[in-house]
Amino acid sequence: MPFYLPRLTRREFLKRTALAGAALALAPSSYAGIFGKSRDRHTFVFFSDTHIAANPAEIYLKVNMTDHLAACVRELAAWPVKPAAVIVNGDLAYLFGKPGDYATFAKGIQSVRPIAPMHLLLGNHDERENFWRAFPQDTVKVKSVPQRQAAVFSSDRANWFLLDSLDVTDKTPGELGAAQLGWLARELDLHPTKPAIVVVHHNPQFPKVTTGLLDTAELMDVLSPHRQVKALIFGHTHDWQITQHVSGVHFINLPPTSYTFKAGRPSGWVRVTLAPDGMEIELRSLDVNHPEHGQVKQLKWRAG
């Protein structure tokens, strides 16, 4: 049963913020501009691997994860148009998916709520039950795969398939499982004409899986013959890169909003704008002096 956070209206947002006494990533005066902006229905924003701890002062690998998320939110709020949706691709919590982690995460994304609806995926540092209890007020539950957070949503130029690769909390590899793969195959059969983009936390890994998606081969057995599948978007590695599978499916490895494992690699967020025959993708690095910051790449869809 996936969770989806609908966009808050101005009245809902201001009322909720006042009642909660929430600390916001933006000054109150900034919100007037947000509510007045137009929406680009073809643009989507991706955050990944936020790793928010209960203690907002927590630091790991010299990075304050809460501060990094706040910086991403501020830049998103300053963007000239509002995206169609914001997708946060797993590892929302720091290590063990504790209730306090999600409480701090919820505060961190509060300023996103009036900007766009949000889809939240899970990674290996999340804990499903704690996560599901963290947003009781306004989550929309959709039936899909029992005990998995999988969903399909449609936009003008693509259908989006959101998967749940959380296997065991704080164990590095992930797994979709036969039930979820079967569900995905059936949903792809039901959505044959529009381009399909699949989003999952764990990275596909070849030929031997040690830290990524344990059923990578089984996933590609589903994706490759469904020619409407054009891209697989994932996180987990904390290493921004774009490659292409032999089948023609684009592999997009999101940067973390938090920390990187390799020196010199960017952290930040990604803007995706869909075209009829592909996508434009831009890295927004938190380090504006990073050589890849602001780079825009054009991806063309495979045939079929």
Describe the role of every protein-language-model region.
Residues M1-E12:
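N-terminal secretory signal peptides
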Residues L8, R16, Y31-A103:
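N-terminal active-site segment of His-dependent metallophosphoesterases
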Residues L19, H51, L92-A93, H125-E127, ...:
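Catalytic metal-binding/acid-base residues of hydrolase active sites
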Residues F35-G36, K98-R186, L190-H191, P195, ...:
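Extended active-site neighborhood of metal-dependent phosphoesterases/phosphodiesterases
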Residues F47-S48, V86-G90, M118-G123, L163, ...:
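Active-site neighborhood of phospho(di)ester-bond hydrolases with catalytic His/Asp-centered motifs
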Residues L92-A93, L166-E175, P204-K208:
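Surface-exposed cleft-lining segments at the edges of enzyme active sites
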Residues H191-P207:
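Short acidic, glycine-rich surface-loop motifs adjacent to enzyme active sites
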Residues G278-G304:
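Acidic, His/Gly-rich catalytic cores of divalent-metal-dependent hydrolytic chemistry
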